[in-house]
Amino acid sequence: MKPRTPPDSPLLFDTAPLVPDFRLELKARKAGHWPVAGADEAGRGPLAGPVVAAAVILDPKRIPEGLNDSKQLSAQRREELFVQILATATVSIASSSSTRIDETDIRKASLDAMRRAICSLAIPASYVLTDGLDVPPGLDCPGQAVVKGDARSVSIAAASIVAKVTRDRMMARAHSVFPDYGFAAHVGYGTAQHRAGIERHGPCSLHRMSFRPLRKTENGPETDELLSE
């Protein structure tokens, strides 16, 4: 006899993509918290460049259509939504440089950037939804960490888009200073092109020397601080 799935339970192997909505924000509002900010970061995995965090408070009456996890969107669609988010929402952006990442670690640097983004919002948040497992310490308001939050909350999705587009633009500028690594193409991730550039030229000042692939390489070209924190 075939086992039955309980009527109110999702299929165990349901792989349908999540679609972000405003339910978590409305739940916080019902509990007395308003406004609600979503926060996310971009750039935890690359071998070079900063980690960038964004915090976004959406206007419930002007939510851009098509918000989703930035990784599920084309570069062109991210750029389009980026413009719409900046025009309709309260947005704050912060970053932690590769130097800060090396001095602490990527988790601490990411949470610090997220904390600074949240605390710099022009309209103080009463509650924060963050993507992942952690709420940054040191906030002036309570918050909730949401696993796969950028696919569940439109506020977090908006923050993921702002962080991703901002970081991609920063790495495009870095490419003009360090053209030997191909930053404009891979934005610092460990692609074959990037690793070949490191092998030929050594790392530059934007590389994260604490990351395992770079720990044994010699210092290459340096420059003044290119990307402000």
Curated annotation (Swiss-Prot):
Pfam families associated with the record = RNase_HII (PF01351)
> InterPro entries under this entry?
RNase_HII (IPR022898), RNase_HII/HIII (IPR001352), RNase_HII/HIII_dom (IPR024567), RNaseH-like_sf (IPR012337), RNaseH_sf (IPR036397)
Single Gene Ontology BP annotation: mismatch repair
| SUPFAM superfamilies for the chain | Ribonuclease H-like
Q: Which cofactor does it need?
A: Mn(2+); Mg(2+)
Segment forming the signal sequence:
none
Q: Where does a divalent metal cation bind?
A: 40-41, 131
- MF term (GO), any: RNA-DNA hybrid ribonuclease activity
A single Gene Ontology CC term: cytoplasm
According to the record, the residues making up region (Disordered) are: 209-229
**Entry's EC annotation:** 3.1.26.4
For this protein, the record's PROSITE patterns field holds:
RNASE_H_2 (PS51975)
Cellular location of this protein? Answer: Cytoplasm
Q: Which domain of life, per UniProt?
A: Bacteria
Q: Which reaction does it catalyse?
A: Endonucleolytic cleavage to 5'-phosphomonoester
Family matches, as HAMAP family: RNase_HII_B (MF_00052_B)
UniProt protein name: Ribonuclease HII
Native species: Rhizobium johnstonii (strain DSM 114642 / LMG 32736 / 3841)
Which gene name does the record give? rnhB
